[in-house]
Amino acid sequence: MNLRIGVIGTGAIGKEHINRITNKLSGAEITAVTDVNQEAAQQTVQDFNLNASVYPDDDSLLAAENVDAVLVTSWGPAHESSVLKAIQHGKHVFCEKPLATTAEGCMRIVEEEMKTGKRLVQVGFMRRYDSGYVQLKEAIDNRVVGEPLMIHCAHRNPTVASNYSTEMAVVDTLVHEIDVLHWLVNDDYESVQVIYPKKSKNALPHLKDPQMVIIETKGGIVINAEIYVNCKYGYDIQCEIVGEDGIIKLPEPSSISLRKEGKFSTDILMDWQRRFVAAYDVEIQDFIDSIRNKGEVSGPTAWDGYIAAVTTDACVKAQESGQKEPVALQEKPAFYQSFTTVNK
């Protein structure tokens, strides 16, 4: 029997997930949708030819008997409420980042999930499912280059929307590095610092771009993370682990190589969707399979969402202060100690 999934929020990412579940993945079907724009929800059902009910709000969708699990793909500030309600209904929930807009909100979700005694919440940090990052994780865990000492990484976008702010460089962009690097080295963050290099001529007047974030872990690893969201040339994700005995680097996306007219070239992708489309597929399939086979989710946890929130808060404070700021995490509950995302 297919897992019956309800979708809360039928915007761009909601439609992407509806499409992959309906047309690409196995073991699940969309049986319910809701959106603050009811016309948009109705149109989504028609566009994808879904045999799904349209509900007026998340309360009615979560109470529906034809819903086993939910995807929360609504506006970020609405995530916390929907996730808490899903937990209270005993339903597994996949939530796109952010899990909540504050660390306090994430902790409320953590506490609510722990009351159930089982893992119900998975956060949408899809990079853990990217084949390149999985290879990095395996190499680090196997100490192929010894202990990690430093990490150099970059998150570059060709351009961003006019409403993109300096703070968003951390809370919307760097948050992916914050999660995946913590997962790669399995070491909590100790402190963060933000440095502003010379401003690019391509940056909007209100935006400080690029930015460099220095993160130190409790185990002494130093991470420098470049954020450059107006690089123009493409969407470029880089990650290099410097170990005691060598260096390992995130592989480039596969592409044909061209030798022509005295030049050797390969393509650079221009958007994040193409760069991580396969990771999104594996991520949602894992959500489906874990529920059907184990009755619990196995991807990034609510605690991972909390770590990301506390770290981004510290980065925003560092943006404003210009100083090194502590990452003040609470002690990890025993409930989450045994949960790690399995390499895919």
Swiss-Prot record:
Pathway: Polyol metabolism; myo-inositol degradation into acetyl-CoA; acetyl-CoA from myo-inositol: step 1/7
Enzyme class per UniProt: oxidoreductase
Known catalytic reactions: myo-inositol + NAD(+) = scyllo-inosose + NADH + H(+); 1D-chiro-inositol + NAD(+) = scyllo-inosine + NADH + H(+)
SUPFAM superfamilies xrefs: Glyceraldehyde-3-phosphate dehydrogenase-like, C-terminal domain, NAD(P)-binding Rossmann-fold domains
GO molecular function, one term: inositol 2-dehydrogenase (NAD+) activity
E.C. designation(s): 1.1.1.18, 1.1.1.369
Keywords: NAD, Oxidoreductase
Superkingdom in the source lineage: Bacteria
PANTHER family: INOSITOL 2-DEHYDROGENASE, PTHR43593
Function: Involved in the oxidation of myo-inositol (MI) and D-chiro-inositol (DCI) to 2-keto-myo-inositol (2KMI or 2-inosose) and 1-keto-D-chiro-inositol (1KDCI), respectively.
Oligomer and partners: Homotetramer.
Protein name: Inositol 2-dehydrogenase/D-chiro-inositol 3-dehydrogenase
Source organism of this protein record: Bacillus velezensis (strain DSM 23117 / BGSC 10A6 / LMG 26770 / FZB42) (Bacillus amyloliquefaciens subsp. plantarum)
